Curated annotation (Swiss-Prot):
Protein name (Swiss-Prot/TrEMBL): Chondroitin sulfate ABC exolyase
Mutagenesis or variant effect for residue 454 to A/D/N/Q: Loss of activity against all substrates
Effect caused by changing residue 514 to A: Loss of activity against all substrates
Species name: Bacteroides thetaiotaomicron
Annotated site residues (Important for catalytic activity against dermatan sulfate substrate) in this chain: 344
Primary role: Broad-specificity glycosaminoglycan lyase, which acts in an exolytic fashion degrading chondroitin sulfates and dermatan sulfate to yield only disaccharide products. Has a preference for chondroitin 4-sulfate over chondroitin 6-sulfate. Has extremely low activity against hyaluronic acid. Is not active against acharan sulfate, heparin or heparan sulfate.
PANTHER family hit by this protein: CHONDROITIN SULFATE ABC EXOLYASE, PTHR37322
Amino acid sequence: MLILSFLCPAFLNAQIVTDERMFSFEEPQLPACITGVQSQLGISGAHYKDGKHSLEWTFEPNGRLELRKDLKFEKKDPTGKDLYLSAFIVWIYNEQPQDAAIEFEFLKDGRKCASFPFGINFKGWRAAWVCYERDMQGTPEEGMNELRIVAPDAKGRLFIDHLITATKVDARQQTADLQVPFVNAGTTNHWLVLYKHSLLKPDIELTPVSDKQRQEMKLLEKRFRDMIYTKGKVTEKEAETIRKKYDLYQITYKDGQVSGVPVFMVRASEAYERMIPDWDKDMLTKMGIEMRAYFDLMKRIAVAYNNSEAGSPIRKEMRRKFLAMYDHITDQGVAYGSCWGNIHHYGYSVRGLYPAYFLMKDVLREEGKLLEAERTLRWYAITNEVYPKPEGNGIDMDSFNTQTTGRIASILMMEDTPEKLQYLKSFSRWIDYGCRPAPGLAGSFKVDGGAFHHRNNYPAYAVGGLDGATNMIYLFSRTSLAVSELAHRTVKDVLLAMRFYCNKLNFPLSMSGRHPDGKGKLVPMHYAIMAIAGTPDGKGDFDKEMASAYLRLVSSDSSSAEQAPEYMPKVSNAQERKIAKRLVENGFRAEPDPQGNLSLGYGCVSVQRRENWSAVARGHSRYLWAAEHYLGHNLYGRYLAHGSLQILTAPPGQTVTPTTSGWQQEGFDWNRIPGVTSIHLPLDLLKANVLNVDTFSGMEEMLYSDEAFAGGLSQGKMNGNFGMKLHEHDKYNGTHRARKSFHFIDGMIVCLGSDIENTNMDYPTETTIFQLAVTDKAAHDYWKNNAGEGKVWMDHLGTGYYVPVAARFEKNFPQYSRMQDTGKETKGDWVSLIIDHGKAPKAGSYEYAILPGTDRKTMTAFAKKPAYSVLQQDRNAHILESPSDRITSYVLFETPQSLLPGGLLQRTDTSCLVMVRKESADKVLLTVAQPDLALYRGPSDEAFDKDGKRMERSIYSRPWIDNESGEIPVTVTLKGRWKVVETPYCKVVSEDKKQTVLRFLCKDGASYEVELEK
């Protein structure tokens, strides 16, 4: 049974959970099943971790505490379907550290089955989560009915609380620390290696600190302080808010011992997942006892202290409150060597810890607590991880997001010693390598501007990671510790790409990860920080491109009233205005809206921009998943990357947002993501069936195709194309296939599909041309009498559509749907234009063109004389030409078996993307791309079940995910003799009057181009 705890003092000390396996010692009498040998046992209120009491155990040398009852141990599921393991969980309090260990023994009818040691060389609370079958010595057995805790060969006293004899837990997350260093020994998860990495040693030698280095340390400290703190005033309202929040924790001292409301990390609730009905992973946060709010308050107090006058009563009060909170949280186990049993993703909970301690460095020094605080920060920031020279480029995006601030704070907390200098050199090198382009699907940044987390381009995680990366690049800029030009330029290119695919600030829907809610945005401040960090080569004090990008982005209402998602870094408007003013005073001006074309091979994304609009295509492949689904996140977005094409637009002079582009969540039919070819399912069937499929992953779904061909080409950064072989995963409708292409030529986007097929006889297959929300009177009036005219359609947002095939218009006022996270019903007024391929189609196809920012007159003229003609549209290739633009666009799904139509390009020796632009009578621009990332070659690495169906497996289980993109040679044969200036990636194989043969070496899904001359 769960005992609810509300945010008021009377409830904050309530026992969290009651269960027969859980001992919290809240009754006045000792439980009858507990006895002692050479021990004194009692219930104590001196220290407590759950409720207000704990078990006090005073022992003689080798004394024993015995608990006799069924321990409820359960073996692991022999079928392998349930991956959880039985764990023993306990919290121990020690007043006097001893360099010794107690032994936990688990017996069945008096016979010892399993055991583990627990070190007691600490003061305060420590926890252990120990899996019986993986972490303990011996062999646990079902029916074990006794727990013994054996004292060391010395007397002492411990307090025990929150003891759970056995409960099934996610076996990935238990964490080793100084007390239980053997737990989960095989893990390499970057959240869980605090103990292992605390043992790392430096490879950079200690050297004396020179005067110049001492000056740089002061500069770094000033820059960091300015980064995390802006001088202000302490208002009476702020002081009163702090007092109220502080009082909730009921911190008191008695006989030199501190106590107060117990504080946990959010993941501690995972102990109860299999113990209580309606378990909520955020229950501790809702109960007001999670440490994120605690550290946020500590930071708030630190800021108030720094904002108050020296010697003032408020300053003295804030100092007292901070030190009391410091003592209490240290006592609660936030200390060197402690991991609370389960610590995964703790970085989000302790974010306020680092700036809070750093801002109170002088106070901690005066109180004699600075060394202890330094060690605490270095432990949780895993600062020793920076010691060894990185073996390769890249680090996890979470490290940039949650560890950079902590690591630099833990280092800058130190006095100016050779050890501090050694840490700074190691840290700047770690940042440098972390910012460089990472291989394969590794985090964080890609050579093409992609920003990776969860093995895909993921802007929602990138905004947090870029906060750390940009701040650290700025911090070290123009010092002897500055990052390399490659590292600096890579992060700059990521930001330039992000401001290209976002419009104006918002992520495209298909690039929103598991948050398709229209709220995710880039962070203009990242551009500001990079602007004042100077140029990548270190020669310029300002970066002009970053400055002008920032001034364009910040001119939007970037801090609007709507609630920003939790994952977005918080930035003050005052800070934005301050840097904007500085840049303008230095002569910088906002850039115009970006124009051109961008292809992200490491995102399976193509973007075309003209005027203020953008068109964003996204697909998926055997390397890059289609959508990420969690329980309660993105329940219906299965088709987000099934060849989608979103038009982001607004009337001239207005800021582009999802709303101005005709999108809202209310009433949106998740089957009809624009551009996709999909089976139109009832929402119950479209809803993700989220599973825990292996030990490498949690409860999540990220499905892959078995096709390598998916991605885009960009010619001269102005035009491009995109192609994909669509093959849905067998988990749902594995017979569904299509060949899809988009051709981006100036202000025209031509969309082609062929070979659409599946065997689903129950529901129709559709290609969605548009689905738009109708939200105001003008839009309702527009659609009242508008049903299109034959091949020409104009929507109410100024986008024109040329549809030479049969299409169906739907006006659903209202249209019902569901929220992506809760599944709650929504409704809104929507219009859709779709191509219906019928049920179980075979050899289905479509053709249409989109002209954003146009008018009906232009569209009518276009329909009479389209600016393109399709030369081939079948399983092998989609080829079209635009005579007025002198462009021929090739999406070659298969190796051509005969001469290609279109003139210049006669054949290629493999599938690829090609674009040819005739620049003059005897000059041609030729662009070639191979969208296959070639992280491995040969057939797709599928595993099949007994029925021959592709099994669902997590991306994290694949051995090739960190491989470099392989080089794929692409040989093209051109009609006639052409002169080519060879490059490292393009060589002439042969040439004569009839033909010229070139070989391109393609990798990274990149586009390679050469100029041909007669």
